[in-house]
Amino acid sequence: MSVIVPIHGPAIAPAPAPERVGVLLVNLGTPDSCDTKGVRIYLREFLSDPRVIENQGLFWKLALNGIILNTRPARKAKDYQKIWNHEKNESPLKTITRAQAEKLSASLGDRGHLIVDWAMRYGNPSLRDRIEALVAKGCSRLLVVPLYPQYSAATSATVCDQAFRVLRELRAQPTLRVTPPYYRDSAYIDALATSIKSHLASLTFEPELIVASFHGMPQAYIDKGDPYQAQCVATVEALRERMGVADDKLLLTFQSRFGFDQWLQPYTDKTIEALARKGVRKLAVVMPGFSADCLETLEEIAQENAEIFMEHGGEEFTAIPCLNDSDAGVQVIRQLVLRELQGWL
């Protein structure tokens, strides 16, 4: 009589769950509160990133911890308080980015294996938390969407840095894709042109010209090879062509300079002051590099620069809203996402 001896081997792993795909929208960041403490926490994280401030040597650390974080947070907190969404107790950037994710999810329809989420590079919800949450929900593939039309090492690249930093700690890593910049994508340019024309049509005055203001950057970063400036120029050139306006009717400037180094020029505030001094009385400003309204658009441009214009002779000023969670704005993101999800859906 033969005897069958059972062979005890390693347990067979269960079949993998159906693959899910995560889409993660990422914007720059925001403090959790508009008080000095909240802004200090945010600025510490932001200004400690070597992609933002490349020289993180002893002098910078002493300046950051000894001077900047003891003076700047109180001033910036007052600015945040001017534009804060008090109903939700959060910054407009957080409100809008959440809405962008929700509307994108709805526009993609009923796809049970597709999950749309959102995060901030600095502050909350953090990239780490949201990537870990998507993985916990079964996402084996992840599309990270930096919401910056123009690429910069200080924006898009640091999103990639942080995403891979999180993945480095995971044993079962999701496959990762990152959307490219979309600075002259036809859907983006069309949406900008339509938004500008629609806003101008709603005004009781006709601006003499439009200033296209982008976030600034140290000139040294461009000299090292960052393509940001060239992509900003390409956006404005495409927008001029799409709108049929002359170069001197749609100007390119750079805002939000910080510190003592030379930044990209011409500067927005100096340009707006000069225009008013030269006799321009009616002005519009659009911020094509911002996918959502934030401190730099709602306070710096719509309030500070409006005051500069009026103080030097201007009479009518308008800040054109960003694309935000408008139908056209969400459609830009949707087209970008669907293009990069090819082969995964």
From Swiss-Prot:
This is Ferrochelatase. Gene3D superfamilies: 3.40.50.1400. Belongs to the ferrochelatase family. It is an enzyme of class 4 (lyase). Keywords: Cytoplasm, Heme biosynthesis, Iron, Lyase, Metal-binding, Porphyrin biosynthesis. Catalyzes the ferrous insertion into protoporphyrin IX. Fe cation binds at H215, E296. InterPro entries: Ferrochelatase, Ferrochelatase_AS, Ferrochelatase_C, Ferrochelatase_N. PROSITE patterns: FERROCHELATASE (PS00534). Its EC number is 4.98.1.1. It comes from Rhodopseudomonas palustris (strain TIE-1). GO terms for molecular function: ferrochelatase activity; metal ion binding. GO terms for cellular component: cytoplasm. It comes from the Bacteria. Pfam families: Ferrochelatase (PF00762). It catalyses: heme b + 2 H(+) = protoporphyrin IX + Fe(2+). Pathway: Porphyrin-containing compound metabolism; protoheme biosynthesis; protoheme from protoporphyrin-IX: step 1/1. It is found in: Cytoplasm. GO terms for biological process: heme biosynthetic process. The lineage of its organism: Bacteria, Pseudomonadati, Pseudomonadota, Alphaproteobacteria, Hyphomicrobiales.
